[in-house]
Amino acid sequence: YTLTSTAQIPATLGVANQASIRRVFSGNTNPPKKVLVYVMDAADVIAADSAVLTWLATQKFDYLAGPDDITAAEAGVIKTWLLNQRSDYHAIYKAVLPDLTADSEAIVDFAGSGILVDGTTFDAAGYCGRIAGLIAGTPMRQSITYAALPEVDDIDRLTSLEMDTAVGKGQLVLYHDGEKVKCGRGVNSLTTVTGKSDIWKKIKIVELLDMVQQDIRLTIQDNYIGKLPNTYDNKLQLVTAISVYLQALAKDDLIASDFSCGIDVDAQDAWLQEQGTPTVDMSEQEIKEANTGTHVFLSIYINPIDAMEDVAVNIYL
């Protein structure tokens, strides 16, 4: 099923499943634009060769959540499948999974518990869909940190130290501020940042970087690959198109204004040498203008802008 509103939820689904989908549509600032629903038999188990994963690989979506009774083994299967999709096929899929130490920017390890809603208590698995919908309904300029869940009456409350410890472990937890329940710091499960920076731990930043990657990739596929001669001037035309896109992101305060996009001279130099073309006496401009067959080498630098989260206020008398 492809749903764009709660009015489209199939009446043939069980009451619990209908309620689960409604929670997804609760969103945050906005509801999710679209919710994909795959219905499995009660006895089905999510495995590496499951039809649901084959189907998902043909769909376009941002966040995935399993059934409310997903097991640890099934969550592990989804993690492995999703990371393979990202590494092998440039997918931008991400997942919200319960109590899963994944150490990946693409997996949100939701660790909420004792989630009380209208007399019913949910565990982390039962509320992953709600969290996935909340993230999907959060504008790119915002993070989910301290996003409220107004329907939640109470949770298993954590101390400040326990919350900090959970965040350090890459867990997304819920926080009760004494009046309402809201999300803790909007982090994914990444804890090992070798070769990366700490910004990859933030749900907001990864969502932005995935969007940029996909937008640029689709623009190149739809408007450039196979459609233009691979001349220097046409390479600059592509550079200009990407730069205009990045300028729009900077105008929306999604990235800093010091972005850059241009021909990757080092990569182009290395390719020319691999083809047997000596470059030692070539100027940088000559390397840029050299014939590179079907290949285009670009380098892009962006500096993502995070949301306001850590505020220190000193009051003096």
Q: What residue spans do the PLM features occupy?
A:
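Structured, hydrophobic secondary-structure cores that serve as assembly/anchoring elements
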Residues: 1-19, 28-30, 135, 167, ...
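A short linear-motif detector with a strong N-terminal bias
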Residues: 13-18, 41-45, 71-73, 124, ...
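A broadly used, surface-exposed interaction patch
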Residues: 15-52
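Residues in well-ordered beta-strands of folded domains
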Residues: 38, 65, 301-303
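A glycine- and small-residue-enriched flexible loop/hinge signal that marks low-structured segments
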Residues: 47-222, 254-269
